[in-house]
Amino acid sequence: MHDQMLMTLHIRFSRSHGAHPALDGAAASCCLRTSTTTVNMSLTIQSQNKVFEGVLTKYSFRSKVLGGLEAKMNVFLPESANAGHKVPVLYFLSGLTCTEDNAAQKGHFFEAAAKEQLAIVFPDTSPRGANIPGEEDSWDFGTGAGFYVNATKEPWNKYYNMYDHVLKEIPQLIASEQIPIDVSRASIFGHSMGGHGALVMYLREQAHFRSVSAFAPICHPTNCETGKKLFEGYLAGGIDDGKQYDAAVLLSKLESSRQVDVLVDCGLNDNFYKQKQLQPESLVEAGKKSGIDTARIQVRLHDGYDHSCTSIANEL
């Protein structure tokens, strides 16, 4: 039977269940555990919280893709997850200046995820501690602003490979560490810069993801100041190379027979929308250009809503 993935917690997906053996005891406890525990020599548990009868665990690990730096992620597992039953997963990508904690603490996802018995994985937004000159000089470049690309410009290319970190390294780590998540049944969503990353990964790697949703995403980064700055900083070919990480460009070049499931929500009171940094309408225009069924590209604009996490909560 074909599984239709629940994306942004509203597109339903038939599911199987599963859970990390190390979490079984924590699932029965409401307390936060802050002592570190090493799991199979690769993952270290930094903390655990019970939430909606499931467990939110913060892990740290050494990332080969990010140049050997320590990386962190949060993983929510619903109550039904256990060693014998794996659950499908949503990857949530956060925006500029965020960490792995922002959406986990403010996104309001867990009640719906628990109801649907879905795992959610929250990666970080960039490497941390690379100590590259200029890395901390700007809020929209460097630390907290990895832009979900694989950098090709030195010295960034040693560390700033968030595309492979999310797409390859984290799913491989989940599988190797026997966290009870079925990585073959995955969808992806995100906010702002993370919405950009989610759209790009879905459009480039549809074999990995069933659907994509994005809140206030940067949809056409080669045509906005934020995207141009990041592409010129990370990519040897600058904006021209950035086209491979531009959702509108990717959509415009898809085969007309390609089946997509794209949902975008954006507030009309979002200052970034007003400044033409987001350009969600470009996705529909790109779909028309490629001949794709644009009914499967939903762009919903909401009067009065802004760029904040409260707007994300409204769309759930």
Positions of predicted regions on the chain:
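Local alpha-helix boundary/kink/capping signal
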Residues: 25-27, 32, 84, 223
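Non-catalytic cap/lid and distal C-terminal segments of serine-dependent acyl enzymes
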Residues: 42-316
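Intrinsically disordered, low-complexity regulatory regions of eukaryotic regulatory proteins
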Residues: 1, 22-23, 268
